């Protein structure tokens, strides 16, 4: 289901009534049970392995680890896994692999390697493996580092596919280069722009891409939500933003939530998306780009919506099924398994 249903509409959101900017990685923000929880409640064995720990608590919500039917841990904090909280312990000894560096291919390879081992030894009914997009943020397709990553990924997909399982491979978003010809980040700092246009009024720009992993993207993405202190200025602000050539889409909250299935109470008064090679920032002073060692690659806009959707069933032609969303992965995996 889309975020209008489950409530998670980004890494980060803002509550105007309290003035709080909050990471959305706590299960309290979930508005529905997870697929894993519902299958677990029906007696299924579940395995969830994430690269970043920020996802683990969300995806593991509702699982119980005292019945030997659930395993949920991250490679980032694999050394902290316990039977009580994760359904597994001494992960690094078990996998014979140390805790990987967060900003590396190794973080994702740990997930895939553990997934193959868990499939063989634990035989879960449902397994979910979530890698990190660090390599995609840093290296364009065809770069030797990117090729090395996909070679590794393909190796483990092959090992998984040797088993009698239904397998779906997809992504949460695409990725595009967001730099000028000199290799410097292309960014529109919308909060600065609005302060210049409306010096007596306050606007808050929130970038849902924001998370602690600033080396990936410097908190610059192609999607932004804007909160207006003075609601009467929303229409005027929309018209001003539409004059920025590098902003591709500007919508009111109501329009954006209807088109993109977002939760209204966690969305800004204005929703913006930048053009293919640009990102959006809040204020120039808030973005520390010193950690970006490679040319910026990021996501969040209309040009990063297309993602791969790969299945391992020769009996299903998904190209004839019309629009498919990445969240349909479990539907098709279950459909293939039933056949």
Feature-to-residue mapping (PLM):
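Feature captures the catalytic ectodomains and active-site-proximal regions of enzymes
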Residues: 1-339
